[in-house]
């Protein structure tokens, strides 16, 4: 469950290390984002010579949340940290690699490029 001012790790090699959510997209009164939702983020920490730099405002897909995600079969999946993948306006990842596992809920949200780049889908 991601809301405004939430800090997230970046799970790709776009050059950003930490980002902060500044808006949850999908309705004017929407407060929270979950796995697969698109948010607007500000880059708070970045590596030198990366594709993005500190202060950039980007869109991102939430790929991991510390709040558990319930599945239709009753099972629950949760992660240790909140993480996101930076995307462009065509909803394609900016980075060329994804680090760490991603949940299969991304498939239902049509983020197939992220699924294909991920080393493990839970």
Curated annotation (Swiss-Prot):
Q: Identify the InterPro entries for this entry.
A: Ribosomal_uL14, Ribosomal_uL14_bac-type, Ribosomal_uL14_CS, Ribosomal_uL14_sf
A Pfam family of this chain: Ribosomal_L14
What protein family does this chain belong to?
A: Belongs to the universal ribosomal protein uL14 family.
Q: What is this protein called?
A: Large ribosomal subunit protein uL14
Keywords attached to this Swiss-Prot or TrEMBL record, sorted alphabetically, are: Ribonucleoprotein, Ribosomal protein, RNA-binding, rRNA-binding
Provide the GO biological process annotations: translation
Alphabetized GO MF terms:
large ribosomal subunit rRNA binding; structural constituent of ribosome
Description of how the protein assembles with itself and partners: Part of the 50S ribosomal subunit. Forms a cluster with proteins L3 and L19. In the 70S ribosome, L14 and L19 interact and together make contacts with the 16S rRNA in bridges B5 and B8.
PANTHER family in the cross-refs: 50S/60S RIBOSOMAL PROTEIN L14/L23, LARGE RIBOSOMAL SUBUNIT PROTEIN UL14M
Q: Which gene encodes it?
A: rplN
Function in brief? Binds to 23S rRNA. Forms part of two intersubunit bridges in the 70S ribosome.
Any one cellular-component term (Gene Ontology): cytosolic large ribosomal subunit
